[in-house]
Amino acid sequence: MDIRWIPLVGKTGYILAAGALIPTYILNDREIVLVDSGLHYDPGLVSFIRAVDVSVYAVLQTHLHEDHVANNRILISRFGTRIIAHRNEVEAVHSRQKMRASWSEIRPETKDKYLRTYSYGIESIENGQEEIVLRDSAFKIVPLYGHSEGHLGFVTPDGVLCTGDAILSPALVQHSKMPYFEDIGQSIDSMKKLLQTDYPYYALAHMEVLEKRDMPGLVKKNLALLERIHVDILELINDPVTLDELVVSVMYGLGIRFRDETRNGYLRNTISQRVRYLVETGRLCKIKSDGEIRYGR
């Protein structure tokens, strides 16, 4: 990918680099802000930024999944960049206990890799905080929980909402079989919240910017995808089954098992969250039988 900067509105634009669309805001003649830092490590990103004679003052993290933080270390090293995320995200990646609670199906070695990945300082955004001011520029904070525990959207001073992974892009919503969300109920609430917003542009991870007129249709497609997945899960259940049995049935029944066990761990985790949501909404029953928890319709 050729690295380039695309202007959008006012001082807001985006850099196409590191396998992603990285939203940017120009703070002043010498400093910019990024929203997330890319899907892949890309040393060319720093070279590009230096070539235009600016530095990265801060990275606002929609969340701290590894496909959004790939260039944090090099930005800190080269520019002394501030990394800023919701407190719940910071705690999740710095605590084995929090990881165990959030990612019960993720392999221990993957959790250890996360702890090593985030062994740098991250500033926290607190619950209820409505904005963050960087230099003299105020960025509105929009809680969009669900994909992860502390997932946030950020509105640039020009009115561009950076949604992170709160909603799937048009391309992804067409092809995803089991998109990853840590809390399905919160994800649905966040998608519905997006319907109530009124911004001229929405920067989606990882490769698309949409205009306001296109968002309602995309939200409805996302909600329809989640409902279709829930119906598919319910249709795979005949007799009551354990969670492990149901997870395996969904993986094979929907044809979404991977060779990579790390990816299977994420998959098992998000299937488990969907089962929990179906129980919470009364569409699945949780049955205790012979000392085991089973799930039935």
Placement of each model-derived feature along the sequence:
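C-terminal regulatory/interaction regions
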Residues: 235-297
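A short catalytic or substrate-binding loop motif that flags glycine-/basic-rich loops and adjacent residues
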Residues: 17-20, 126, 145-148
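Metallo-beta-lactamase
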Residues: 138-227
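Pre-recognition alpha-helix immediately N-terminal to the DNA-recognition helix
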Residues: 228-236
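Aromatic/hydrophobic pocket-lining residues that form the small-molecule binding cavity
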Residues: 69, 187, 271
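Conserved beta-strand hairpin/beta-sheet module of binuclear metal-dependent hydrolase folds
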Residues: 1-51, 153-164
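Active-site HxH/HxHxD metal-binding segment of metal-dependent hydrolases
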Residues: 39-133
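Active-site neighborhood of phospho(di)ester-bond hydrolases with catalytic His/Asp-centered motifs
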Residues: 34-38, 56-67, 84-87, 143-146, ...
